[in-house]
Amino acid sequence: QLIIRGVTLINGDGSPPMGPVDIVVENNTILSINGVGYPGIEIKESDRPKLKKGGKELDANGMYLLPGFIDMHGHIGGASQGANPEYVFKLWMAHGITTVRQPSGRGVKEVNELKRKSKNNEIVAPRIFGYTGFGQGAKKTISTEQEARAWVRENAKNGADGIKFFGAEPEIMSAALDENQKLGLGSACHHAQLSVARWNVLHSARAGLTSMEHWYGLPEALFEDRTVQNYPLDYNYKNEQHRFEEAGKLWAQAAKPFSKHWNNVMNELIALDFTLDPTFNIYEASRDL
């Protein structure tokens, strides 16, 4: 048992802050939220929930409490990032992130094991939803609709929560998303420039994609007079800074906000219940060590 005492609660449903309250948590579930008085007035101990033997309590007087944050696009990272999962998990937890959608990177078996340990409280970590990179683990490049459907079924059998796409031939994307939707799993797509000229956000949404990631694919769906963005002569897709640098210029090539085409795209995405996951982040991350 855990009791968080005297905190001011912001519960996330649009209601204003309220406190002081004592919040009782047992076995990963909030059992009760108990009003224990009024601001500036001494709290009567008789009005407070009692702590069970072996339980813990936190004095949160003067503090605010919110529900855990959900990070819809959080990479656990790998050797190239120089951090092990434990370090990443503790950073997330320290910043209030209690659920994370892990969109590809580590293999499905490793993510499933971390997810299991988190669920069983064997490690300090958020709840994990693992999305496998499309084609990850396949013996060869997926080149037919049948191979796409077979891989999707195998991914579901392996216990993944969904798929992270980067783009593929249109018929392969259609087949994979159709099969994935039949199985009831989630899907996300970073519409990489390598495929976006033939398959943008509108194509994905119509085919059943759950969410787009970053900005990729949306301005291309808003193009009116072109299919391919205006790449500078020295552009190199493998240089991520080129991609980021051209992103702002890309929007300037799209339909103007609230124009007919802009509104048509927006309204269709809303009608399809499509999710935009923009993953806002800082451009420079550094620490004074």
Regions found by a protein language model. Give the residues of each.
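Divalent metal-dependent hydrolysis catalytic cores, especially in the metallo-beta-lactamase
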Residues: 88-109, 125-135, 156-168, 177, ...
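Divalent metal-binding pocket/active-site signature
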Residues: 144, 161-204, 213, 258-260, ...
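Active-site neighborhoods of metal-dependent hydrolases
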Residues: 138, 151-161, 218-289
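Histidine-rich, glycine-flanked metal-binding segment
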Residues: 9, 15-66
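Active-site-adjacent beta->alpha loops and helix N-cap segments on the catalytic face
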Residues: 107-114, 167-181, 222-233
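Metal-associated gating/positioning segment near the N- to mid-region
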Residues: 48-50, 55, 63-122, 140-146, ...
